[in-house]
């Protein structure tokens, strides 16, 4: 699908990343198409798996999670023994994102907590799987975006 994305598709992606609740009529106006053509393009992007969903952005601080950290985990187990860790990742909603990576660290996670003690509890749980390195997040310099985002 990527080779078939045209300038209009990229414009649609930029707009829906900026505002996932934008009405088709407004989206159509911004990308210079009719509402029906815009709706068809969005449907095609969804069916192709380019647009995978629409989510609300939740401010962790406003929901009682003022502490954010990046936790890196060196997991010593062989590749097939990662299921116990994956179960913990599913159970702990404070772990917002987890990426399996190359290099010294096997996993990199974005974690939120209600306090430093709460963060310590989460890190201690993760440390049962291997050595961890934790960095506190001071601020978000660049918000999460997709490729070609906000063009």
Positions of predicted regions on the chain:
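A compositional/biophysical signature of low hydrophobicity enriched in polar/charged and small residues
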Residues: 1-151
